[in-house]
Amino acid sequence: MIVLLYVTSLAICASGQPRANQAKGESYSPRYICSIPGLPGPPGPPGANGSPGPHGRIGLPGRDGRDGRKGEKGEKGTAGLKGKTGPLGLAGEKGDQGETGKKGPIGPEGEKGEVGPAGPPGPKGDRGDQGDPGLPGVCRCGSIVLKSAFSVGITTSYPEERLPIIFNKVLFNEGEHYNPATGKFICAFPGIYYFSYDITLANKHLAIGLVHNGQYRIRTFDANTGNHDVASGSTVIYLQPEDEVWLEIFFNDQNGLFSDPGWADSLFSGFLLYVDTDYLDSISEDDEL
């Protein structure tokens, strides 16, 4: 279609029709001759501004701009109003013990308490000055006589080791303070006592000792010479009531104690030398009461 219109235009331009007012005999030449377009002319002057057009529609909102740089720290604002107390929170874990606080002020004086129990005895004080002589005492010499004595023998040989030797043959027993069933003397009065033993030995060595409340006071050793021999010992001891004294063999296989009622004895004896004077004074006071 476009090509057809272009060809038609060219044909019209090429036609040589004379002008209507052409004089007779005047040569005719076409007024319009189609040719190749010329070069564009220079731009014309700007035209006058047109009247403003109507406002266009409001466009869609643009995208948010980027965040600006962080500004400088502002001044501290005024304190706000105190808020309401929040709900009670859960109990926390127990903290460490704090440091001891400062001593508080002295409180008011309390009421007087009851008398407490007596305290323990204090240390021994210094010795005081000597007092004035007292009134003459009353002699009670011979008014109180306390007796304790025994002497016993044995009828068997070679007793067991480390046990009280049973001296079952009673020769004398003042006050019955020696017990022939146990072989022990039991103290009845506090005071000074004398003890002795004379032991016949034969066929074995002898190791015998005098015992006071489980402790050896004296020990005697005698060797077997093939003949009969006698081992002796004696001592003085202070005894308290219920103290016990006895004889025993203190070494294994050295129990050579020998007895033959027909011609040889082994003896254990003891007696009270004198009673403790404090004990006598306490007895005298009891008698006066």
UniProtKB/Swiss-Prot annotation:
One of its GO terms (molecular function) is identical protein binding. Residues 48-61, 78-91 have a biased composition (Low complexity). Keywords: Collagen, Secreted, Signal. One of its GO terms (cellular component) is collagen trimer. Residues 38-139 form the Collagen-like domain. Residues 36-134 are annotated as: Disordered. It comes from the Eukaryota. Residues 63-76, 93-102 have a biased composition (Basic and acidic residues). Residues 1-16 form the signal peptide. It is found in: Secreted. This is Complement C1q tumor necrosis factor-related protein 7. It comes from Mus musculus (Mouse). The lineage of its organism: Eukaryota, Metazoa, Chordata, Craniata, Vertebrata. The gene is C1qtnf7.
